[in-house]
Amino acid sequence: GSMKKVMNLKNLLFCALFALTMSLNAVNVQAETLDYLGQTIDGSILTDKLESSGEYLSVARSTYLHQGTVRITNNGGGYVGIFGGTECNVSCNTVKLNVYLERSNGNGNFYSYQKWENVEYNTNSVYMSKQVKVEKGYYYRLRGYHSCTKNGVIENGGSVTDGIYIG
């Protein structure tokens, strides 16, 4: 029975080494992603900040669309907080807020991860706020599409945050 004991010890050692190697690999991937801190992808700076906001401010001659905002927060544990709003100067027939959650590994473009479309009628604003669980090891950002429609006239604009690292 002594041979068996030796085998078990070897297996145990191998498993321990394997586990160690795997965890080191995970750390490496994270380090690689963090190597891209400070770079800009598609207009968004890659940051390790806990939150980032983006704003669309209407041009002076705009009649209906006042402003649009998006904000992303790192809530810890792989959760991000998502906030968005579209505000019109007056009550409009249709008020829209589309929020796009996008992610990048720092090495490539931002890709669509999740999206929400919000619409309200005969009002002057629409907001959304939620918390979602995301995959760790990526930079996440929000893009907002904001529009106010009245009497057949549409005014719209876009907003975007920087990328925040979720690890």
State the predicted function of each range:
Residues 61-101:
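Short, surface-exposed binding/anchoring microloops in extracellular/periplasmic proteins
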Residues 125-133:
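Exposed aromatic-hydrophobic patches
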Residues 151-167:
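Short beta-strand elements
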Residues 142-144:
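Hydrophobic/tyrosine-rich beta-strand signature of extracellular beta-sandwich/beta-rich modules
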Residues 1-73:
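N-terminal prepro-regions of secreted/extracellular proteins
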